[in-house]
Regions:
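Basic/aromatic-rich interaction segments and small domains that mediate binding to polyanionic partners
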Residues: 2-55
Length: 55
């Protein structure tokens, strides 16, 4: 699966967020998890194996 910056992804743990940074090599990326008001709740590092879908 190809993941790009600003894609919205669903992680295998059920959280959804926007990819805000892809690390060199493209194997890991940073996902911003936000609430309904757009406030950032968490920034998590993830890999393709942690991703259920690009939505």
């Amino acid at each position: 699966m190809k993941i790009n910056e600003l894609d919205v992804v669903r992680l295998k743990d059920g959280r959804e967020g926007a990819v805000v940074h892809i690390y060199p090599g493209g194997k890991a990326y940073c996902v911003e998890i936000a609430d309904n008001y757009g406030q950032t709740l968490d920034l998590v590092g993830a890999e393709e194996k942690d991703t259920a879908a690009v939505i």
